[in-house]
Amino acid sequence: LWWLPEPRWFALPLALLGAFWLLLPRGTPGKALAVLLWLPLLWPDRRLPAPGEAELVVIDVGQGLSVLVRTANHSLLFDAGPAVRDGFDAGERAVVPALHALGVRRLDAAVASHGDQDHAGGLAAVLRAFPAPLRFAPPDVEGAALRGLRLRTCEAGREWRWDGVRLRFLHPPAHFPYLRNESSCVLRIDTEHGSALLTGDIGEVVERDLVRRAALSPADSLRADVVLIAHHGSAESSDPAFVRATGARYALASSGHGNRFGHPRADVLERWRRPARRSPTPPRMGPCGSGSARRRTGARAGRARFWNRDAKHTRGCGTRPGARLGYPIARIEVGHGPEVRECWNW
């Protein structure tokens, strides 16, 4: 079965126009040209990063995490969202369809930041559809979702390059015991124009240790344009020293809409606002309406229900390339020129 990326919004109307044209009475001029109107539907535009650039796509898996990292010729999935026994599997229901819609044909690597279900639960379903040859997880990882998988360790210092983009693990260091959240893989992505930091569920203790190690080694620098706020924006993450060390222009919090934990915490978001004197980009993950590259109102805000008073406070930002996708994803382009672009999508 061959999956095509989701086409642009105008592809289906053009295809219908072509079908109508072919059904016109015999002798209608130019009927053979009607087939050309099907091309946008059958061969959609695959927008891929150029060499030296990377694209981050945050997939809305509810209260969990799943991030696609894509370079010109390679793809990596960082976590695969939650799954529960005999219940919802975000890997099957959200991640795999989103990868198909994005035109991903293979995964070159998959990372389970740690063994908790909200991060690794959907990995088995993803690997059935996209059997990634490289699979990373913390040393001695525990978790039902990872049993039986052949895994490499995401030990600090392990790095490689894809298409001019450097990917490097910053945590956990060698001989670090498995402590669930505190053992989360931390991945740094460096492009020609910008950088990103994916932090898993680490807490303030590990964040302070990363600041200390960054001061000793330039290779472990925390400076980044885009930072994934650790642990969904919980109160146990985002140490002020860590926030300052990143100097992030954009901060992303992956959390379920209306979750019972109150993620992301308002005080945590304020820590990220303060250094840059600007709002972090992801008040909450969730659907957003289509629009231009400027700030806009999300779909939840535009279609707020009377039982959800907080919906009007959900905002999003976007770039036109992501606005065409019919899946709940947030797109960040790292290093697409000097600016980091973003999209909170439906």
How would you name each of these model-derived features?
Residues 1-57, 70, 250, 270-281, ...:
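Transmembrane helix-bundle segments that form internal channels/tunnels in multi-pass membrane proteins
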Residues 59, 63, 91-100, 113, ...:
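Active-site-proximal loop/helix segments of hydrolase catalytic cores
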Residues 339-345:
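Short, intrinsically disordered C-terminal tails of secreted or membrane-associated proteins
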Residues 81-83, 140-141, 156, 174, ...:
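Short, acidic/turn-prone active-site loops that include or flank metal/cofactor-
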Residues 14, 120-121, 125-212, 273-283, ...:
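Flexible, acidic/histidine-containing loops and adjacent segments that form or flank the divalent-metal
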Residues 50-169:
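Soluble catalytic regions of membrane-associated enzymes that act on cell-envelope
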